[in-house]
From Swiss-Prot:
It holds the Pfam family DAHP_synth_2. It is found in: Plastid, Chloroplast. Disulfide bonds: none annotated. The lineage of its organism: Eukaryota, Viridiplantae, Streptophyta, Embryophyta, Tracheophyta. One of its GO terms (molecular function) is 3-deoxy-7-phosphoheptulonate synthase activity. This is Phospho-2-dehydro-3-deoxyheptonate aldolase 2, chloroplastic. One of its GO terms (cellular component) is chloroplast. The keyword Membrane does not apply. Its main location: plastid. It comes from Oryza sativa subsp. japonica. The gene is DAHPS2. Residues 1-23, 41-70 are annotated as: Disordered.
Protein backbone atom coordinates (compact mmCIF):
# COMPACT_ATOMS: atom_id res chain seq x y z
CA UNK A 1 0.00 0.00 0.00
CA UNK A 2 1.40 3.41 -0.97
CA UNK A 3 0.96 6.32 1.39
CA UNK A 4 -0.20 9.56 -0.20
CA UNK A 5 2.70 11.26 1.54
CA UNK A 6 5.11 9.45 -0.76
CA UNK A 7 3.84 11.08 -3.94
CA UNK A 8 6.32 12.72 -6.28
CA UNK A 9 7.30 16.28 -5.49
CA UNK A 10 6.06 19.13 -7.59
CA UNK A 11 8.89 21.23 -8.98
CA UNK A 12 8.26 24.91 -8.42
CA UNK A 13 10.20 25.74 -11.57
CA UNK A 14 8.25 23.32 -13.72
CA UNK A 15 4.84 24.41 -12.48
CA UNK A 16 3.12 27.03 -14.58
CA UNK A 17 3.18 30.40 -12.88
CA UNK A 18 -0.22 31.75 -11.95
CA UNK A 19 -0.41 35.31 -13.14
CA UNK A 20 -2.23 37.74 -10.96
CA UNK A 21 -5.68 38.49 -12.30
CA UNK A 22 -6.85 42.11 -12.46
CA UNK A 23 -7.94 43.16 -9.02
CA UNK A 24 -11.74 43.15 -8.58
CA UNK A 25 -13.32 46.48 -7.73
CA UNK A 26 -13.15 47.25 -4.04
CA UNK A 27 -16.47 47.92 -2.37
CA UNK A 28 -16.57 51.40 -0.88
CA UNK A 29 -16.54 51.47 2.88
CA UNK A 30 -18.68 54.06 4.60
CA UNK A 31 -17.24 53.82 8.08
CA UNK A 32 -16.16 57.14 9.53
CA UNK A 33 -12.59 56.06 10.03
CA UNK A 34 -9.45 56.90 8.15
CA UNK A 35 -7.96 53.64 7.03
CA UNK A 36 -4.26 53.64 7.73
CA UNK A 37 -2.04 51.96 5.16
CA UNK A 38 -1.12 48.47 6.27
CA UNK A 39 2.59 47.98 5.76
CA UNK A 40 3.47 44.33 6.08
CA UNK A 41 5.19 41.70 3.99
CA UNK A 42 4.15 38.11 4.29
CA UNK A 43 7.03 35.86 3.39
CA UNK A 44 5.31 32.73 2.18
CA UNK A 45 8.70 31.29 1.46
CA UNK A 46 11.03 32.22 4.33
CA UNK A 47 13.87 32.39 1.85
CA UNK A 48 12.16 35.35 0.15
CA UNK A 49 11.88 37.37 3.34
CA UNK A 50 13.82 40.61 3.49
CA UNK A 51 13.93 40.58 7.26
CA UNK A 52 11.64 41.74 10.03
CA UNK A 53 8.81 43.96 8.91
CA UNK A 54 6.50 45.87 11.18
CA UNK A 55 2.78 45.43 10.42
CA UNK A 56 0.88 48.61 11.09
CA UNK A 57 -2.91 48.77 11.22
CA UNK A 58 -5.50 51.03 12.70
CA UNK A 59 -5.89 49.86 16.27
CA UNK A 60 -9.40 49.65 17.62
CA UNK A 61 -8.37 47.29 20.42
CA UNK A 62 -5.11 46.02 21.90
CA UNK A 63 -5.42 42.96 19.63
CA UNK A 64 -4.46 45.05 16.63
CA UNK A 65 -0.99 45.95 17.90
CA UNK A 66 1.48 44.63 15.36
CA UNK A 67 4.54 42.63 16.27
CA UNK A 68 7.81 42.29 14.38
CA UNK A 69 8.27 39.22 12.26
CA UNK A 70 9.55 36.26 14.21
CA UNK A 71 10.71 33.00 12.73
CA UNK A 72 9.51 30.22 15.04
CA UNK A 73 12.29 28.04 16.34
CA UNK A 74 12.85 24.77 14.51
CA UNK A 75 11.38 25.73 11.14
CA UNK A 76 13.59 25.05 8.16
CA UNK A 77 13.38 26.29 4.61
CA UNK A 78 9.95 25.75 3.09
CA UNK A 79 9.45 23.99 -0.24
CA UNK A 80 6.29 22.75 -1.90
CA UNK A 81 7.06 19.22 -0.70
CA UNK A 82 8.73 19.91 2.68
CA UNK A 83 5.51 18.68 4.31
CA UNK A 84 6.52 15.12 3.38
CA UNK A 85 9.17 15.16 6.09
CA UNK A 86 6.44 15.70 8.71
CA UNK A 87 3.83 13.38 10.15
CA UNK A 88 0.71 13.57 7.97
CA UNK A 89 -2.64 12.59 9.47
CA UNK A 90 -5.93 11.92 7.67
CA UNK A 91 -4.33 10.97 4.34
CA UNK A 92 -5.50 7.88 2.41
CA UNK A 93 -3.40 4.89 1.42
CA UNK A 94 -3.47 4.38 -2.34
CA UNK A 95 -2.98 0.85 -3.71
CA UNK A 96 -0.75 1.97 -6.59
CA UNK A 97 2.06 4.48 -6.12
CA UNK A 98 2.65 4.52 -9.87
CA UNK A 99 -0.94 5.51 -10.65
CA UNK A 100 -0.90 8.14 -7.90
CA UNK A 101 2.26 9.73 -9.27
CA UNK A 102 0.82 9.74 -12.78
CA UNK A 103 -2.36 11.51 -11.65
CA UNK A 104 -0.44 14.13 -9.67
CA UNK A 105 1.84 14.89 -12.62
CA UNK A 106 -1.26 15.34 -14.78
CA UNK A 107 -2.81 17.78 -12.31
CA UNK A 108 0.46 19.74 -12.23
CA UNK A 109 -0.10 20.56 -15.91
CA UNK A 110 -3.67 21.83 -15.37
CA UNK A 111 -4.44 25.57 -15.22
CA UNK A 112 -4.97 27.08 -11.76
CA UNK A 113 -8.53 27.05 -10.43
CA UNK A 114 -8.11 30.56 -8.97
CA UNK A 115 -5.58 33.37 -9.37
CA UNK A 116 -3.14 34.85 -6.89
CA UNK A 117 -4.45 38.40 -7.30
CA UNK A 118 -7.92 37.30 -6.25
CA UNK A 119 -6.52 35.69 -3.10
CA UNK A 120 -4.64 38.88 -2.27
CA UNK A 121 -7.83 40.92 -2.65
CA UNK A 122 -9.63 38.53 -0.30
CA UNK A 123 -6.85 39.00 2.24
CA UNK A 124 -7.48 42.76 2.14
CA UNK A 125 -11.19 42.24 2.75
CA UNK A 126 -10.51 39.84 5.63
CA UNK A 127 -8.24 42.48 7.14
CA UNK A 128 -11.24 44.84 7.09
CA UNK A 129 -13.24 42.21 9.00
CA UNK A 130 -10.42 41.90 11.55
CA UNK A 131 -10.73 45.63 12.23
CA UNK A 132 -14.54 45.57 12.44
CA UNK A 133 -15.06 47.16 9.03
CA UNK A 134 -16.65 44.15 7.30
CA UNK A 135 -18.47 40.91 8.10
CA UNK A 136 -17.54 37.52 6.62
CA UNK A 137 -20.19 35.11 5.32
CA UNK A 138 -18.70 31.68 4.69
CA UNK A 139 -21.10 28.90 3.75
CA UNK A 140 -21.80 25.89 1.60
CA UNK A 141 -21.95 22.12 1.59
CA UNK A 142 -20.49 19.90 4.28
CA UNK A 143 -18.91 17.89 1.46
CA UNK A 144 -19.47 18.27 -2.27
CA UNK A 145 -20.44 15.12 -4.13
CA UNK A 146 -20.16 13.86 -7.66
CA UNK A 147 -23.73 12.51 -7.64
CA UNK A 148 -25.47 15.79 -6.74
CA UNK A 149 -23.35 17.99 -8.99
CA UNK A 150 -25.70 20.06 -11.14
CA UNK A 151 -26.31 23.69 -12.01
CA UNK A 152 -29.53 23.99 -10.01
CA UNK A 153 -27.89 22.97 -6.73
CA UNK A 154 -25.02 25.41 -7.28
CA UNK A 155 -27.45 28.20 -8.20
CA UNK A 156 -29.73 27.61 -5.21
CA UNK A 157 -26.89 27.72 -2.68
CA UNK A 158 -25.38 30.82 -4.29
CA UNK A 159 -28.80 32.48 -4.28
CA UNK A 160 -29.24 31.95 -0.54
CA UNK A 161 -25.75 33.32 0.09
CA UNK A 162 -26.67 36.43 -1.91
CA UNK A 163 -29.88 36.86 0.07
CA UNK A 164 -28.06 36.41 3.37
CA UNK A 165 -25.37 38.85 2.28
CA UNK A 166 -27.90 41.57 1.47
CA UNK A 167 -29.64 41.15 4.83
CA UNK A 168 -26.38 41.17 6.79
CA UNK A 169 -25.03 44.17 4.92
CA UNK A 170 -28.12 46.29 5.55
CA UNK A 171 -28.37 45.27 9.19
CA UNK A 172 -24.69 45.79 9.91
CA UNK A 173 -24.29 48.78 7.57
CA UNK A 174 -20.96 47.33 6.48
CA UNK A 175 -19.65 45.34 3.50
CA UNK A 176 -20.17 41.58 3.60
CA UNK A 177 -17.28 39.40 2.44
CA UNK A 178 -18.93 36.43 0.76
CA UNK A 179 -16.39 33.62 1.01
CA UNK A 180 -18.35 30.89 -0.73
CA UNK A 181 -16.65 28.17 1.27
CA UNK A 182 -17.41 24.53 0.77
CA UNK A 183 -17.98 25.01 -2.97
CA UNK A 184 -15.64 24.41 -5.91
CA UNK A 185 -13.26 22.22 -3.93
CA UNK A 186 -14.73 21.03 -0.61
CA UNK A 187 -14.60 17.27 -1.17
CA UNK A 188 -12.21 15.65 1.32
CA UNK A 189 -13.39 15.06 4.89
CA UNK A 190 -11.41 14.08 7.99
CA UNK A 191 -12.69 11.01 9.81
CA UNK A 192 -12.58 10.01 13.47
CA UNK A 193 -11.96 6.38 12.54
CA UNK A 194 -9.99 4.95 9.62
CA UNK A 195 -12.45 2.09 9.28
CA UNK A 196 -16.22 1.66 9.39
CA UNK A 197 -17.95 -1.54 10.45
CA UNK A 198 -21.47 -2.65 9.52
CA UNK A 199 -22.98 -6.04 10.30
CA UNK A 200 -19.56 -7.49 10.96
CA UNK A 201 -18.07 -6.13 7.71
CA UNK A 202 -15.13 -3.75 8.20
CA UNK A 203 -14.14 -1.37 5.38
CA UNK A 204 -12.11 1.85 5.05
CA UNK A 205 -14.10 4.95 6.02
CA UNK A 206 -15.57 7.20 3.35
CA UNK A 207 -13.24 10.21 3.08
CA UNK A 208 -14.95 12.28 0.40
CA UNK A 209 -15.67 11.85 -3.28
CA UNK A 210 -12.19 12.98 -4.33
CA UNK A 211 -10.75 9.99 -2.43
CA UNK A 212 -13.25 7.10 -2.40
CA UNK A 213 -16.96 6.32 -2.74
CA UNK A 214 -19.66 6.37 -0.08
CA UNK A 215 -21.23 3.06 -1.13
CA UNK A 216 -20.46 0.47 1.53
CA UNK A 217 -18.62 -2.13 -0.53
CA UNK A 218 -14.97 -3.05 -0.88
CA UNK A 219 -14.50 -1.70 -4.41
CA UNK A 220 -16.04 1.69 -3.65
CA UNK A 221 -14.03 2.25 -0.47
CA UNK A 222 -10.61 1.71 -2.09
CA UNK A 223 -8.92 5.13 -2.54
CA UNK A 224 -8.77 5.96 -6.24
CA UNK A 225 -6.38 8.73 -7.38
CA UNK A 226 -8.39 9.24 -10.59
CA UNK A 227 -11.08 10.83 -8.41
CA UNK A 228 -8.78 13.84 -7.93
CA UNK A 229 -8.97 14.61 -11.65
CA UNK A 230 -12.76 14.46 -11.54
CA UNK A 231 -12.78 16.69 -8.45
CA UNK A 232 -10.60 19.24 -10.26
CA UNK A 233 -12.94 19.25 -13.28
CA UNK A 234 -16.01 19.68 -11.07
CA UNK A 235 -14.33 22.50 -9.12
CA UNK A 236 -13.50 24.38 -12.31
CA UNK A 237 -17.02 23.92 -13.68
CA UNK A 238 -18.58 25.05 -10.40
CA UNK A 239 -16.41 28.15 -10.20
CA UNK A 240 -17.11 28.99 -13.84
CA UNK A 241 -20.85 28.93 -13.16
CA UNK A 242 -20.46 30.97 -9.97
CA UNK A 243 -18.48 33.62 -11.84
CA UNK A 244 -21.25 33.80 -14.46
CA UNK A 245 -23.91 34.21 -11.77
CA UNK A 246 -21.85 36.86 -9.97
CA UNK A 247 -21.24 39.06 -13.01
CA UNK A 248 -24.09 38.25 -15.40
CA UNK A 249 -26.96 40.02 -13.63
CA UNK A 250 -28.15 37.15 -11.43
CA UNK A 251 -26.63 38.86 -8.37
CA UNK A 252 -28.31 42.24 -9.00
CA UNK A 253 -29.36 43.93 -5.77
CA UNK A 254 -32.93 44.52 -6.96
CA UNK A 255 -33.33 40.82 -7.76
CA UNK A 256 -31.90 39.73 -4.40
CA UNK A 257 -34.13 42.18 -2.53
CA UNK A 258 -37.21 40.84 -4.31
CA UNK A 259 -36.22 37.30 -3.33
CA UNK A 260 -36.11 38.36 0.32
CA UNK A 261 -39.51 40.06 0.06
CA UNK A 262 -40.97 36.94 -1.54
CA UNK A 263 -39.44 34.82 1.22
CA UNK A 264 -41.10 36.93 3.91
CA UNK A 265 -44.46 37.01 2.10
CA UNK A 266 -44.59 33.24 1.67
CA UNK A 267 -43.01 32.11 4.91
CA UNK A 268 -44.41 31.38 8.33
CA UNK A 269 -41.85 33.72 9.86
CA UNK A 270 -44.14 36.39 11.26
CA UNK A 271 -41.48 38.36 13.09
CA UNK A 272 -42.27 41.98 12.30
CA UNK A 273 -38.60 42.99 12.54
CA UNK A 274 -37.59 40.69 9.67
CA UNK A 275 -40.35 42.04 7.45
CA UNK A 276 -39.37 45.58 8.37
CA UNK A 277 -35.76 45.02 7.40
CA UNK A 278 -36.68 43.44 4.06
CA UNK A 279 -38.98 46.36 3.21
CA UNK A 280 -36.41 48.94 4.32
CA UNK A 281 -33.92 47.55 1.80
CA UNK A 282 -36.60 47.77 -0.91
CA UNK A 283 -37.43 51.35 0.09
CA UNK A 284 -33.74 52.32 -0.04
CA UNK A 285 -33.54 51.03 -3.61
CA UNK A 286 -36.73 52.91 -4.49
CA UNK A 287 -35.27 56.12 -3.08
CA UNK A 288 -32.12 55.67 -5.16
CA UNK A 289 -34.16 55.22 -8.32
CA UNK A 290 -36.29 58.29 -7.56
CA UNK A 291 -33.14 60.33 -6.94
CA UNK A 292 -31.82 59.37 -10.34
CA UNK A 293 -29.17 56.96 -9.07
CA UNK A 294 -29.03 54.16 -11.60
CA UNK A 295 -29.61 50.65 -10.34
CA UNK A 296 -28.09 49.30 -13.54
CA UNK A 297 -24.57 50.33 -12.55
CA UNK A 298 -22.17 47.35 -12.23
CA UNK A 299 -21.81 48.05 -8.51
CA UNK A 300 -25.52 47.16 -8.19
CA UNK A 301 -25.63 44.23 -10.60
CA UNK A 302 -22.48 42.28 -9.77
CA UNK A 303 -20.80 40.94 -6.65
CA UNK A 304 -17.36 39.81 -5.55
CA UNK A 305 -16.99 36.35 -4.09
CA UNK A 306 -14.30 33.87 -3.20
CA UNK A 307 -13.97 30.14 -2.56
CA UNK A 308 -12.46 28.17 0.30
CA UNK A 309 -12.10 24.61 1.52
CA UNK A 310 -10.27 22.54 4.10
CA UNK A 311 -6.67 21.83 3.15
CA UNK A 312 -6.69 18.09 3.75
CA UNK A 313 -5.57 16.05 0.73
CA UNK A 314 -2.01 17.39 0.57
CA UNK A 315 -0.84 15.64 -2.63
CA UNK A 316 -3.70 17.31 -4.54
CA UNK A 317 -3.06 20.70 -2.91
CA UNK A 318 0.65 20.48 -3.70
CA UNK A 319 -0.05 19.68 -7.34
CA UNK A 320 -2.09 22.89 -7.68
CA UNK A 321 0.46 25.10 -5.94
CA UNK A 322 2.03 27.65 -8.28
CA UNK A 323 4.65 30.37 -7.96
CA UNK A 324 3.04 33.74 -8.66
CA UNK A 325 4.88 35.52 -11.45
CA UNK A 326 4.20 38.99 -10.03
CA UNK A 327 5.27 38.46 -6.41
CA UNK A 328 7.43 35.34 -6.41
CA UNK A 329 5.24 33.87 -3.66
CA UNK A 330 3.62 30.46 -3.81
CA UNK A 331 -0.18 30.17 -3.87
CA UNK A 332 -2.32 27.07 -3.57
CA UNK A 333 -4.46 27.75 -6.62
CA UNK A 334 -7.16 25.23 -5.71
CA UNK A 335 -9.02 27.94 -3.73
CA UNK A 336 -8.71 31.54 -2.61
CA UNK A 337 -8.70 30.60 1.08
CA UNK A 338 -7.76 27.37 2.85
CA UNK A 339 -8.28 26.26 6.40
CA UNK A 340 -6.61 23.68 8.63
CA UNK A 341 -8.97 21.47 10.58
CA UNK A 342 -9.19 20.45 14.21
CA UNK A 343 -7.65 17.04 13.49
CA UNK A 344 -4.69 18.26 11.40
CA UNK A 345 -3.49 21.47 13.09
CA UNK A 346 -0.53 19.92 14.96
CA UNK A 347 2.31 22.44 15.26
CA UNK A 348 4.83 19.94 13.88
CA UNK A 349 2.43 18.30 11.43
CA UNK A 350 2.48 18.08 7.64
CA UNK A 351 -0.61 20.23 7.07
CA UNK A 352 0.75 23.18 9.06
CA UNK A 353 4.11 22.79 7.31
CA UNK A 354 2.44 22.99 3.89
CA UNK A 355 0.20 25.93 4.77
CA UNK A 356 2.95 28.08 6.29
CA UNK A 357 4.52 28.38 2.85
CA UNK A 358 1.53 29.31 0.70
CA UNK A 359 0.47 32.95 0.59
CA UNK A 360 -3.31 32.35 0.57
CA UNK A 361 -5.43 33.66 3.43
CA UNK A 362 -5.67 30.84 5.99
CA UNK A 363 -8.29 29.68 8.47
CA UNK A 364 -7.69 27.75 11.68
CA UNK A 365 -10.55 25.65 13.07
CA UNK A 366 -10.51 25.92 16.86
CA UNK A 367 -12.53 23.86 19.35
CA UNK A 368 -12.77 24.04 23.13
CA UNK A 369 -9.73 21.73 23.24
CA UNK A 370 -7.39 24.43 21.91
CA UNK A 371 -4.81 25.64 24.42
CA UNK A 372 -4.37 29.43 24.17
CA UNK A 373 -0.57 29.11 24.12
CA UNK A 374 -0.75 26.60 21.27
CA UNK A 375 -3.01 28.92 19.30
CA UNK A 376 -0.49 31.76 19.65
CA UNK A 377 2.33 29.44 18.53
CA UNK A 378 0.31 28.22 15.55
CA UNK A 379 -0.44 31.78 14.44
CA UNK A 380 3.28 32.63 14.77
CA UNK A 381 4.14 29.73 12.45
CA UNK A 382 1.51 30.58 9.85
CA UNK A 383 1.81 34.37 10.00
CA UNK A 384 5.28 35.40 11.20
CA UNK A 385 4.83 38.86 9.63
CA UNK A 386 1.56 39.44 11.54
CA UNK A 387 -0.14 40.52 8.33
CA UNK A 388 -3.80 41.53 8.81
CA UNK A 389 -6.17 39.30 6.82
CA UNK A 390 -3.75 36.38 6.68
CA UNK A 391 -5.28 34.43 9.60
CA UNK A 392 -8.95 33.78 10.35
CA UNK A 393 -9.82 31.91 13.55
CA UNK A 394 -12.95 29.77 13.08
CA UNK A 395 -14.30 28.82 16.51
CA UNK A 396 -16.46 25.70 16.89
CA UNK A 397 -17.18 24.68 20.46
CA UNK A 398 -20.87 24.87 21.45
CA UNK A 399 -22.58 27.76 23.24
CA UNK A 400 -21.55 26.99 26.82
CA UNK A 401 -17.95 26.16 25.94
CA UNK A 402 -17.85 29.33 23.84
CA UNK A 403 -18.61 31.49 26.86
CA UNK A 404 -15.95 29.76 28.96
CA UNK A 405 -13.13 29.11 26.47
CA UNK A 406 -13.29 31.87 23.86
CA UNK A 407 -12.38 34.76 26.22
CA UNK A 408 -9.07 33.07 27.07
CA UNK A 409 -8.24 32.60 23.39
CA UNK A 410 -9.07 36.21 22.55
CA UNK A 411 -6.94 37.50 25.44
CA UNK A 412 -3.97 35.29 24.53
CA UNK A 413 -4.03 36.45 20.91
CA UNK A 414 -4.47 40.08 21.94
CA UNK A 415 -1.62 39.94 24.46
CA UNK A 416 0.68 38.47 21.80
CA UNK A 417 -0.08 41.42 19.51
CA UNK A 418 -1.41 39.15 16.77
CA UNK A 419 -3.99 40.43 14.28
CA UNK A 420 -6.65 37.87 13.34
CA UNK A 421 -10.22 37.74 12.07
CA UNK A 422 -12.60 35.94 14.43
CA UNK A 423 -15.55 34.07 12.95
CA UNK A 424 -17.86 31.44 14.40
CA UNK A 425 -18.75 27.98 13.13
CA UNK A 426 -21.90 27.18 15.15
CA UNK A 427 -22.47 23.87 13.37
CA UNK A 428 -19.81 21.37 14.44
CA UNK A 429 -20.16 21.84 18.18
CA UNK A 430 -23.90 21.11 18.08
CA UNK A 431 -24.22 17.75 16.34
CA UNK A 432 -26.46 15.19 18.06
CA UNK A 433 -27.94 11.82 17.15
CA UNK A 434 -31.71 11.72 16.59
CA UNK A 435 -33.83 8.83 17.92
CA UNK A 436 -33.95 7.46 14.36
CA UNK A 437 -30.14 7.23 14.33
CA UNK A 438 -29.48 10.12 11.92
CA UNK A 439 -27.11 12.94 12.84
CA UNK A 440 -28.79 16.32 13.21
CA UNK A 441 -28.22 19.79 14.62
CA UNK A 442 -30.86 21.76 16.56
CA UNK A 443 -31.42 25.26 15.19
CA UNK A 444 -31.81 26.62 18.72
CA UNK A 445 -28.36 25.29 19.67
CA UNK A 446 -26.82 26.84 16.55
CA UNK A 447 -28.44 30.16 17.39
CA UNK A 448 -27.29 29.92 21.02
CA UNK A 449 -23.67 29.55 19.91
CA UNK A 450 -23.97 32.54 17.57
CA UNK A 451 -25.33 34.64 20.42
CA UNK A 452 -22.55 33.44 22.73
CA UNK A 453 -19.99 34.42 20.08
CA UNK A 454 -21.34 37.98 19.90
CA UNK A 455 -21.70 38.23 23.68
CA UNK A 456 -18.08 37.23 24.29
CA UNK A 457 -16.74 39.69 21.73
CA UNK A 458 -18.87 42.46 23.25
CA UNK A 459 -17.44 41.53 26.65
CA UNK A 460 -13.84 41.46 25.40
CA UNK A 461 -14.02 44.55 23.20
CA UNK A 462 -13.03 42.56 20.12
CA UNK A 463 -14.67 42.23 16.72
CA UNK A 464 -17.10 39.41 15.79
CA UNK A 465 -15.88 39.13 12.22
CA UNK A 466 -18.18 36.62 10.57
CA UNK A 467 -19.97 33.28 10.43
CA UNK A 468 -19.13 29.91 8.88
CA UNK A 469 -22.10 27.64 8.04
CA UNK A 470 -22.75 24.24 6.55
CA UNK A 471 -25.84 25.01 4.48
CA UNK A 472 -27.60 24.40 1.21
CA UNK A 473 -30.11 26.19 -0.98
CA UNK A 474 -32.20 23.04 -1.15
CA UNK A 475 -35.27 22.33 0.97
CA UNK A 476 -33.64 19.52 2.95
CA UNK A 477 -34.67 18.25 6.38
CA UNK A 478 -31.36 17.69 8.15
CA UNK A 479 -31.28 20.22 11.02
CA UNK A 480 -34.26 20.29 13.38
CA UNK A 481 -36.05 23.48 14.40
CA UNK A 482 -36.38 26.88 12.80
CA UNK A 483 -39.63 28.77 12.28
CA UNK A 484 -40.73 26.24 9.65
CA UNK A 485 -40.22 23.62 12.29
CA UNK A 486 -38.36 20.50 11.22
CA UNK A 487 -38.95 17.72 13.76
CA UNK A 488 -37.14 14.46 14.44
CA UNK A 489 -39.93 12.71 12.51
CA UNK A 490 -39.27 14.93 9.46
CA UNK A 491 -35.56 14.11 9.17
CA UNK A 492 -35.94 11.10 6.90
CA UNK A 493 -38.13 13.03 4.40
CA UNK A 494 -35.30 14.88 2.63
CA UNK A 495 -32.07 13.87 4.35
CA UNK A 496 -29.58 14.09 1.48
CA UNK A 497 -26.24 14.99 3.06
CA UNK A 498 -23.20 12.79 2.36
CA UNK A 499 -21.64 13.78 5.65
CA UNK A 500 -22.97 16.21 8.27
CA UNK A 501 -26.42 17.86 8.51
CA UNK A 502 -26.86 21.25 6.83
CA UNK A 503 -29.18 24.20 7.35
CA UNK A 504 -31.77 24.41 4.60
CA UNK A 505 -32.57 27.60 2.69
CA UNK A 506 -35.25 28.79 5.12
CA UNK A 507 -33.16 28.13 8.22
CA UNK A 508 -30.11 29.85 6.69
CA UNK A 509 -32.03 33.01 5.83
CA UNK A 510 -33.77 33.06 9.20
CA UNK A 511 -30.37 32.95 10.89
CA UNK A 512 -29.15 35.81 8.67
CA UNK A 513 -32.07 38.02 9.76
CA UNK A 514 -31.30 37.30 13.43
CA UNK A 515 -27.60 38.10 12.98
CA UNK A 516 -28.46 41.27 11.04
CA UNK A 517 -30.54 42.47 13.97
CA UNK A 518 -27.64 41.75 16.33
CA UNK A 519 -25.25 43.66 14.06
CA UNK A 520 -27.70 46.57 13.94
CA UNK A 521 -27.94 46.74 17.73
CA UNK A 522 -24.17 46.55 18.05
CA UNK A 523 -23.79 49.38 15.54
CA UNK A 524 -26.35 51.56 17.32
CA UNK A 525 -24.64 51.02 20.69
CA UNK A 526 -21.27 52.00 19.29
CA UNK A 527 -22.68 55.04 17.50
CA UNK A 528 -20.88 54.05 14.31
CA UNK A 529 -22.80 55.18 11.22
CA UNK A 530 -25.88 56.05 13.26
CA UNK A 531 -26.21 59.26 11.28
CA UNK A 532 -25.66 57.78 7.83
CA UNK A 533 -28.81 57.29 5.72
CA UNK A 534 -27.80 54.41 3.47
CA UNK A 535 -25.54 51.36 3.48
CA UNK A 536 -22.75 50.96 0.90
CA UNK A 537 -24.01 50.05 -2.53
CA UNK A 538 -21.84 46.98 -3.06
CA UNK A 539 -22.62 43.66 -1.49
Amino acid sequence: MALATNSAAVSGGAAAAASSAPQPRLAATFLPMRRRTVSAVHAADPAKSNGPVQAAAKASSPSTVAAPEKKPVGLGKWTVDSWKAKKALQLPEYPSQEELDSVLKTIETFPPVVFAGEARHLEERLADAAMGRAFVLQGGDCAESFKEFNANNIRDTFRILLQMGAVLMFGGQMPVVKVVGRMAGQFAKPRSDSFEERDGVKLPSYRGDNINGDTFDEKSRVPDPQRMIRAYAQSVATLNLLRAFATGGYAAMQRVTQWNLDFMDHSEQGDRRYRELAHRVDEALGFMTAAGLTVDHPIMTTTDFWTSHECLLLPYEQSLTREDSTSGLFYDCSAHMLWVGERTRQLDGAHVEFLRGVANPLGIKVSDKMNPRDLVKLIEILNPSNKPGRITIITRMGAENMRVKLPHLIRAVRNSGQIVTWITDPMHGNTIKAPCGLKTRPFDSILAEVRAFFDVHDQEGSHPGGIHLEMTGQNVTECIGGSRTVTFDDLSDRYHTHCDPRLNASQSLELAFIIAERLRRRRMRSGVNSNLPLPPLAF
